[in-house]
Amino acid sequence: MTKVQSSSLNICHIIAGAGTGGAETFCLDMVKALHERGIKQTVISRPHQHVVSAFAERGITHYPMGFQRWWKYPQQRKIRSIIRAETPDLVHCWMNRASSFVPSDLSQPVLGWFGGYYDLKNYRNCDFYMGVTRDIVRHIGEASGKPDRAYLGHTFGTLAADPPVRRSDFGLPDDKPLVLLLSRMHWKKGVDLLLEAAAQLPDMVFLMAGDGPDLEKYQRQANQLGVADRVCFAGWRHDRAALLNIADICVLPSRYEPFGTVIAEAWFAGVPLVATRADGAKQYVTHEKDGLLSDIDDLDMLVDNLGRLAIDPALGNRLIKHGKQTYEELFERESVTSRLITNYEDMIARYHSGLR
C-alpha cells in the first residue's frame, strides 16, 4: 500500500485544452488527486462546465480564460497578474497551448507537460519538462539539449467508482462478448479499422465511447458494413469505470498513441486489453502477458486477438493478472501523485538554487 504523502505546496495549473479528451481528463484527475493531498491550487483554464463544477465542489480557485491566439498578449498579461496575486511555488502548464501562453518574466519555475511528441517551440518559457512515457522524455531531452530538465510523469489508471450502468442502457445484449473503445472519434485512433473488425466478428458487440470530428463518418461506416445493430456510439462519457465494468475486452486500435491512459485504466479495472503497437503501448504492454498487441493497421491480427479473448477465458485471466501487476508497479494513483509532488519539490529546489 502506497504511503499517502501530503504537502504544503502551492501550484498554479494552466490548462488550455478541450473539454473532452484523454489528456484533458487526466489533467482534471490529477488536480483532484493533488487536492486530496491538501495542496493549494489555482487553475487557469477554459470554462468547460464539468471542469468548473469540479473545481467549485472542491473550493479550488479557478480563473476562466479562452486562450484565443489572436488575443494572446492581453491574456498573457492576465496570467501574469493572476500568478503575482496567487504567488504559487510552481506553474504547471499542461500541453502546447498552455505552455505557449505562459509569460517569460515569472519569479517561479515553470513546468511544461508533454502528452505526446510535441514541438518544443511552444515551451520556450518553461524551465522544466515532463513526459508521460520514457520515450517522450527521451524526445524532450534530445530536442531541448537539456535532458536533466526532463522528468518522467506517468498518468494513473485508478478510477473512482461510478453509478452502475447496464448493457441494455446502450441497446446491447448481455449474452455476447462486449468490446469497449474509450477514444476520440478520429482517424488516428483506428476506429475505422475496429469497425471493419466488427464485421468479421458477428458474435461480438461494440461500445464506442467518445466524440470527435469523425463520429458521423464512423456511424455511416457502421451502417455500410451492416454492423450498426451491434455497435453503439455512446458519445463522450465521464463514467469510464462503469463502462469498463460491463466490458469483456478493452480495445485501443490506434495508429498514433503516445501513451493512452485507457491502457492503465483497463489494467486497473481488470479488463483484458487489446492494443496496437503504437508508441505508448509498445513501451508498456508485453504481448501475451498483460495485453495482446497487433501491428498498426493489421486487420487480421486485430480480429484474431479479439476473437481469441472471446473464446479463451484462461488467456483473459492471465492478461488481467499481469495487467494488475503492471498497473500497481507504474500507474497506481497514489504512487503517481506522490512522484509528481516529489518532482515538484525537486524542480522548485533546483530553480531557487540557481539552476536555470
What are the language-model segments listed below?
Residues W71-Q75, H92-S99, F114:
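Short His-centered aromatic/hydrophobic patch
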Residues I44, P272-A275, V285:
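Short hydrophobic beta-strand element within catalytic cores of glycosyltransferases
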Residues K121, I263-E265, A278-L293:
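Short acidic/histidine- and often glycine-rich active-site loop of Leloir-type glycosyltransferases
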Residues W236, R255:
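Aromatic "clamp/platform" in nucleotide-sugar-dependent glycosyltransferases that forms part
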Residues H287-E288, L292-D300, R308-P313:
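Conserved acidic donor-binding segment of nucleotide-sugar-dependent glycosyltransferases
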Residues Y63, D127-D162:
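Donor nucleotide-sugar binding/catalytic pocket of nucleotide-sugar-dependent glycosyltransferases
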Residues G21-K32, P177-Q200, P213-Q219, D300:
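A conserved mid-protein helix/loop that constitutes part of the nucleotide-sugar donor-binding site
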Residues M301, R308, L315-L330, V336-T342:
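A short, well-ordered alpha-helix in the C-terminal region of glycosyltransferases
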